[in-house]
Amino acid sequence: MLDYKFIKENVEAVKQNIKNRHMNADADKAVELYDKRTALVTSLQNLQKDRNDNSQSMKQKLSPEERQKLVDQGKAIKEKIAQVEAELAEAEKALHEAVSKIPNMAHPEAPVGKEDSDNLEVKRCGTVPKFDFEPKDHVQLGQDLDLIDFEAGTKVSGVKFYFLKNEAVFLEQALTMYGLNILRKHGFKPFITPDIAKEEILYGIGFNPRGEESNVYSLEGEGTCLVATAEITLGGYHSDEIIKKESLPLKYCGLSHCFRREAGAAGQFSKGLYRVHQFSKLEMFVYCTPEESDALHEELRLIEEEIFNGLGIPFRVVDTCTGDLGAPAYRKWDLEAWMPGRNGGEWGEVTSTSNCTDYQARRLNIRYKDDDGKNKFLHTLNGTALAMSRAMIAVLENYQQADGSIKIPEALVPYCGFDRIG
């Protein structure tokens, strides 16, 4: 959430940012409501002063008529205060709702665009494999090697669910331990997080827990949702808290299941493990001072690069365009791995990392005490270490062999206990 005063003083820039992001929000309405709230606050303060003056006057020596007049005035002031307080509460609610729809400001260097095709490639790492055979996609590999059962997943749970089987189970656990050990080396505190969060926490992070376009599974009548990422639970961990500055940055990593409705998702790249309703993910989350957030954002991206370089998976880094940014993100980097099973080979997103500045902290009321003793909103960042399903696609497709087997990346062999599948 943006600061109310910032919107008031920078309304044209805020409106342009909304336009660049292709989002629906009304900055002018927010300013109008802000002005209304300000006027009501002033009115309330004046009435409270009148009430105090009336109370002081009652302490003087008065005739019965004078006292009754002050009593009547006091009652009128009290009624007016109650009326203005009610109007102020409504204005506060309307202002909060209007501002909550306004996205974070985008980084000035973020490419302006509408969708992921407008993202800007900034680097490539690794060598795209050249096969002397027709490479299979992970769906066919999973079927041939008895690793993934989509048919049983659909029968038991519905479409976009699956069973991992046999060596694929060990492969997912190997990816998990590989990622955890890298994050531990970088000073991250590990968590296994709840799979359910309150709606107000999702709202604070920037997810829409309700509505037809919501990507979230809500638990009817509970006021809770299945989490789409550990960003939600790790971000809510310090809600309504004041954190000591000397303890910052706080670097957390959370392992969780992730549940996503994927409403409206379709197309060839939605097949198999790429876009499913449930998967496991290792997520990074950082709380820091505003001065640290840009550097820490680079650090998160470099950790993601380290993870995929260590796996020997070719990838590229893209600077996400304004239209492809989530509402909380100030800037976002995506890592896209090479996936040979896509039409003979294409890039597919495997991680992202976002600097959300103070957008989430304002919504969740997370602050730190600065050197001057003032409580200020801190910055939050998040980044995917490993989304296991997509990482598995990259491993299976890039490491497939001519005989139909899968070679295990060297970094994963100690965790798997085997070096080949098939």
Curated annotation (Swiss-Prot):
It catalyses: tRNA(Ser) + L-serine + ATP = L-seryl-tRNA(Ser) + AMP + diphosphate + H(+); tRNA(Sec) + L-serine + ATP = L-seryl-tRNA(Sec) + AMP + diphosphate + H(+). It is found in: Cytoplasm. It is an enzyme of class 6 (ligase). GO terms for cellular component: cytoplasm. Pathway: Aminoacyl-tRNA biosynthesis; selenocysteinyl-tRNA(Sec) biosynthesis; L-seryl-tRNA(Sec) from L-serine and tRNA(Sec): step 1/1. PROSITE patterns: AA_TRNA_LIGASE_II. Keywords: Aminoacyl-tRNA synthetase, ATP-binding, Cytoplasm, Ligase, Nucleotide-binding, Protein biosynthesis. L-serine binds at T229, A230, E231, E283, T384. Its main location: cytoplasm. ATP binds at R260, R261, E262, V276, E349, V350, T351, S352. InterPro entries: aa-tRNA-synt_IIb, aa-tRNA-synth_II, aa-tRNA-synth_II/BPL/LPL, Ser-tRNA-ligase_type_1, Ser-tRNA-synth_1_N, SerRS_1_N_sf, SerRS_core, tRNA-bd_arm. Its EC number is 6.1.1.11. GO terms for molecular function: ATP binding; serine-tRNA ligase activity. Transmembrane segments: none annotated. One of its GO terms (biological process) is selenocysteine biosynthetic process. Catalyzes the attachment of serine to tRNA(Ser). Is also able to aminoacylate tRNA(Sec) with serine, to form the misacylated tRNA L-seryl-tRNA(Sec), which will be further converted into selenocysteinyl-tRNA(Sec). Consists of two distinct domains, a catalytic core and a N-terminal extension that is involved in tRNA binding. Homodimer. The tRNA molecule binds across the dimer. Belongs to the class-II aminoacyl-tRNA synthetase family. Type-1 seryl-tRNA synthetase subfamily. This is Serine--tRNA ligase.
